[in-house]
């Protein structure tokens, strides 16, 4: 019965929503004027087109989205474009060896010493003379591990980090760029591996009294087996970026204590859990308000592509999905970059 409801909701969603916005997997290519329904709370759009049964699924597969019921519909739709919808009812494409880093490791192997890992960007200038032939290029000054500095000169720059004002404080921003990027806000997302000895099965956190069964926030989506005994993939969501690693760990410890009290995990799980691998992904889901979307924010943002020798990429411009990131790169960034370089 539940599967039938999901399939009916998926059909309604595909027919009434995705068919109208075929660009959804290619980036935030929002038309001007902006369709009003893209700025509605997502639950209202779901009610309008009878696909409410999908919202819990979208929240689960896009952890952490923010409150799936209240986020602007544009962001909810980005969480379930045609590509992911086909995979949900078909098959997912995975790395053959299970290592999602493989493509990046291979790229690093090709680039060799040109990859400056663990370096800090000190200063970025994007409309400067770099040599006798290139009167308008970019320079990037970076501080490397150990304290040494390196100056990079190039014709063009691709920026793939979340473009929050904090992240790009070292850039020579124009008034227009500052005005746009200062509109962004972000969620918090902390992930890692938790070792819980004696726990032998995955656990999913389902909100019994929350909209569309979302976990209470700050909270985790569960403990998912990492493939080795006692190791579980964990992720903690926050409403903003004002938290510490200890705050994230405390959420998981509290969850384990609650589970231990009802016998779902070993009784000492909260006291003995360790976190051998952790990673803080904030700022996560960098977004703007429905009012900004309505005012044509994404058309203005897209107009920055190629300006001042700079191309912008990454999840902020495409969505938190590797396939979407690469689709935007191939459809927008690379064609523009190659044209500018005369390739």
Q: Which residues are covered by each model-predicted region?
A:
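Conserved beta-strand termini and adjacent loop/short-helix elements that scaffold enzyme active sites
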Residues: 118-120, 143, 313
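Active-site-proximal substrate-binding core of FAD-dependent oxidoreductases
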Residues: 337-343
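Dinucleotide-binding Rossmann-like beta1-alpha1 core, especially the glycine-rich loop
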Residues: 1-19, 31-32
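Active-site/ligand-binding neighborhood in enzyme catalytic cores
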Residues: 18-132
């Amino acid at each position: 019965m539940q599967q039938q409801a999901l399939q009916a909701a998926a059909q309604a969603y595909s027919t009434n929503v995705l068919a109208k916005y075929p660009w959804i997997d290619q980036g935030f290519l929002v038309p001007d004027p902006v369709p009003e329904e893209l700025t509605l709370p997502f639950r209202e759009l779901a009610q309008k087109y009878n696909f409410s049964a999908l919202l819990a699924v979208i929240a689960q597969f896009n952890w952490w989205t923010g409150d799936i019921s209240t986020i602007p519909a544009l962001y909810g739709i980005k969480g379930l474009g045609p590509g992911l919808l086909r995979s949900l009812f078909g098959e997912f494409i995975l790395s053959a060896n299970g290592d999602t880093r493989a493509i990046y490791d291979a790229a690093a192997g090709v680039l060799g010493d040109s990859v400056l890992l663990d370096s800090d960007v000190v200063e970025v200038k994007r409309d400067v003379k770099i040599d006798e032939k290139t009167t308008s290029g970019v320079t990037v000054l970076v501080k490397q591990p150990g304290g040494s500095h390196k100056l990079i000169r190039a014709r063009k720059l691709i920026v793939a980090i979340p473009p929050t004002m904090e992240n790009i404080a070292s850039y020579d921003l124009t008034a227009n760029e500052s005005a746009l990027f200062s509109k962004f806000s972000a969620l918090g997302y902390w992930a890692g591996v938790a070792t819980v000895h004696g726990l032998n099965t995955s656990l999913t956190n389902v909100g019994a009294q929350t909209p569309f069964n979302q976990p209470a926030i700050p909270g985790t989506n569960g403990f998912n087996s990492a493939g080795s005994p006692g190791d579980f993939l964990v992720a903690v969501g926050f409403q903003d970026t004002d938290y510490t690693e200890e705050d994230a760990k405390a959420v998981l410890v509290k969850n384990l204590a609650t589970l231990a009290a009802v016998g779902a995990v070993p009784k000492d799980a909260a006291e003995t859990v360790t976190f051998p691998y952790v990673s803080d992904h904030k700022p996560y889901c960098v977004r703007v308000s429905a009012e900004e979307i309505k005012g044509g924010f994404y058309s203005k943002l897209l107009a920055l592509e190629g300006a001042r020798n700079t191309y912008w990429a990454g999840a902020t411009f495409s969505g938190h999905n590797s396939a979407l990131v690469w689709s935007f790169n191939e459809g927008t960034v690379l064609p523009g970059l190659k044209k500018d370089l005369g390739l």
